[in-house]
Amino acid sequence: KGFMTPERAAEFNFR
C-alpha cells in the first residue's frame, strides 16, 4: 500500500 495511490499520482501529474 502506498505505491500508485491517488495522492502519489497527483504528485506525478504535478511535475
UniProtKB/Swiss-Prot annotation:
Keywords: Allergen, Muscle protein. The keyword Cytoplasm does not apply. Troponin I is the inhibitory subunit of troponin, the thin filament regulatory complex which confers calcium-sensitivity to striated muscle actomyosin ATPase activity. Belongs to the troponin I family. This is Troponin I. The lineage of its organism: Eukaryota, Metazoa, Ecdysozoa, Arthropoda, Crustacea.
